UniProtKB/Swiss-Prot annotation:
<keyword id="KW-0067">ATP-binding</keyword>
<comment type="subunit">
    <text>The DNA replisome assembles sequentially on oriC in this order; DnaA, DnaD, DnaB, DnaI-DnaC helicase. Monomer in the absence of ATP, in its presence forms a probable homohexamer which is not active as a helicase in vitro. Interacts separately and simultaneously with helicase loaders DnaB and DnaI. Interaction with DnaB does not require ATP. Interaction with DnaI requires ATP, probably forms a DnaC(6):DnaI(6) complex, which is not active as a helicase.</text>
</comment>
<keyword id="KW-0378">Hydrolase</keyword>
<feature type="domain" description="SF4 helicase">
    <location>
        <begin position="179"/>
        <end position="445"/>
    </location>
</feature>
<dbReference type="InterPro" id="IPR007692">
    <property type="entry name" value="DNA_helicase_DnaB"/>
</dbReference>
<dbReference type="GO" id="GO:0006260">
    <property type="term" value="P:DNA replication"/>
</dbReference>
<keyword id="KW-0547">Nucleotide-binding</keyword>
<keyword id="KW-0963">Cytoplasm</keyword>
<dbReference type="InterPro" id="IPR027417">
    <property type="entry name" value="P-loop_NTPase"/>
</dbReference>
<keyword id="KW-0413">Isomerase</keyword>
<dbReference type="GO" id="GO:0003677">
    <property type="term" value="F:DNA binding"/>
</dbReference>
<protein>
    <recommendedName>
        <fullName>Replicative DNA helicase DnaC</fullName>
        <ecNumber>5.6.2.3</ecNumber>
    </recommendedName>
</protein>
<feature type="binding site">
    <location>
        <begin position="210"/>
        <end position="217"/>
    </location>
    <ligand>
        <name>ATP</name>
    </ligand>
</feature>
<dbReference type="GO" id="GO:0005829">
    <property type="term" value="C:cytosol"/>
</dbReference>
<keyword id="KW-0639">Primosome</keyword>
<dbReference type="GO" id="GO:0005524">
    <property type="term" value="F:ATP binding"/>
</dbReference>
<dbReference type="InterPro" id="IPR036185">
    <property type="entry name" value="DNA_heli_DnaB-like_N_sf"/>
</dbReference>
Length: 454
């Protein structure tokens, strides 16, 4: 395959490259347009790379960019003869009658450059497949990363005129005004939480943090179930701590109001079997997709969610939990930097796929040393930039976790410590431990299946 590639001329368009350089000679202000799109390496011909680089150097110094100054700059760096001398520069300067089409020519040069990068990347991936002895997962992750770098170069966005943004913003406001209710995002199913957040917004990274055994996994799973069973949105769940079967057992308990211990032991009554059948039917019709790969890389999460969105649609991503995700390995000697890199990538995934990403997080033991055990931002374990990247940071706190004699048994506080586009505050829910289920406080005794002492 390498021989086949070596026999073929890589994608390039010399005329377009000359047109870009000629347009800059003709109208130096065209350099600004070109520099927003092209870097020297985008030019196929080496001489064009050096000429364009000289133009950029002059532009950065605030000096005029014309035939005389570019010739002088190349001569001063002993590159004039390498690029073809003054005669070739003159030919380029005379090659285009107008600079009006520079953006069109620059786009051609950029696209040819992307194709060459893609070919080089694919060739490297193929060679690594034959020669490297790394774990297959490492090769896949690295291959995906390099392909993504090529794709991201293509997808860089330009400035948007505020007039265009205002039109889109007005349309969105009008849609919000015309819709019923105050929920503008994806409803969690918890009334007071939805009232405070207006639902979880697309593009948002939501961090849910708590000490072990407080109920953060149950809380997140309840949200996932509510979304998947009560809306037409699909939910991707990445469980790095528990297997898929354990998660499904928990979801069956919550969906069917089945005692968790009875389900674990198989000690089910006839009524329980009926509830189980109902719960299985409800969950099987929901769009819940579970990946229980331990130690999954953030690049794998991105790739799998991309594929899922293309094939089945995607409305929400849930990750349990953030500190178990592997980063790229670039910051392997500094775990805090690696976790910061992961949180930035998760925010990037939320924006790219336009879905809320809920990432559970551990809290440090520092919270145990204070008299008031309610968590604070500084308690997020290996926090790094987590609190900066997150749009919402929610802490879970249960008084009976620390005080067994408290009157607030099975009441959990959802402390919204940060909300980028909304208020902060506290929402209280009831936790029905037997069912691994959270319910709105006003519903606490509504369901006959929920014991009064819950």
């Amino acid at each position: 395959m390498t021989d086949l590639l070596n026999d073929r001329l890589p994608p390039q368009n010399i005329e377009a490259e000359q047109a870009v350089l000629g347009a800059i000679f003709l109208q130096p202000s065209a350099l600004t347009l070109a520099s927003e799109v092209l870097i020297p390496d985008d030019f196929y011909r080496m001489s064009h790379q050096k000429i364009y680089n000289a133009m950029l150097v002059l532009g950065d110094r605030g000096e005029p960019v014309d035939l005389v100054t570019v010739t002088s700059e190349l001569a001063n760096t002993d590159l004039l003869e390498e690029v073809g001398g003054i005669s070739y520069l003159t030919d380029i300067a005379n090659s285009v009658p107008t600079a009006a089409n520079i953006e069109y020519y620059a786009k051609i040069v950029e696209e040819k450059s992307i194709l060459r990068r893609l070919i080089r990347t694919a060739t490297t991936i193929a060679q690594d497949g034959y020669t490297r002895e790394d774990e297959v997962e490492d090769l896949l992750s690295e291959a995906e990363k390099t392909i993504m770098e090529v794709a991201q170069r293509k997808n860089t966005s330009a400035f948007q005129n505020i007039k265009d943004v205002l039109v889109q913003t007005y349309d969105n406001i009008e849609q919000l005004h015309n819709r019923k209710g105050d929920i503008t995002g994806i409803p969690t199913g918890f009334t007071e939480l939805d009232r405070m957040t207006a639902g979880f917004q697309r593009n948002d990274l939501i961090i849910v943090a708590a000490r072990p055994s407080v109920g953060k996994t149950a809380f997140a799973l309840n949200i996932a179930q509510n979304v998947a069973t009560k809306t037409d949105e699909s939910v991707a769940i990445f469980s790095l701590e528990m297997g898929a079967e354990q998660l499904v057992m928990r979801m069956l308990c919550a969906e069917g109001n089945i005692n968790a211990q009875n389900l674990r032991t198989g000690n089910l009554t006839e009524e329980d079997w009926g509830k189980l059948t109902m719960a299985m039917g409800s969950l099987s019709n929901s769009g819940i997709y579970i990946d229980d790969t331990p130690g999954i890389r953030v690049s794998e999460i991105r790739a799998k969610c991309r594929r899922l969105k293309q094939e089945s649609g995607l409305g929400m991503i849930l990750i349990d939990y953030l500190q178990l995700i592997q980063g790229s390995g670039r910051s392997k000697d500094n775990r805090q930097q690696e976790v910061s890199e992961i949180s930035r990538e998760l925010k990037s995934i939320a924006r790219e796929l336009q879905v809320p990403v809920i990432a559970l997080s551990q809290l440090s033991r520092g919270v145990e040393q204070r008299q008031d055990k309610r968590p604070m931002m500084s308690d997020i374990r290996e926090s790094g930039s987590i609190e900066q990247d997150a749009d919402i940071v929610a802490f879970l706190y249960r008084d009976d976790y620390y005080d067994k004699e408290t009157e607030n048994k099975n009441i959990i506080e959802i402390i919204i410590a940060k909300q980028r586009n909304g208020p902060v505050g506290t929402v209280s829910l009831a936790f029905v431990k037997e069912y691994n289920k959270f319910v709105n406080l006003e519903r606490r005794f509504d369901d006959a299946g929920v014991p009064p002492g819950a």
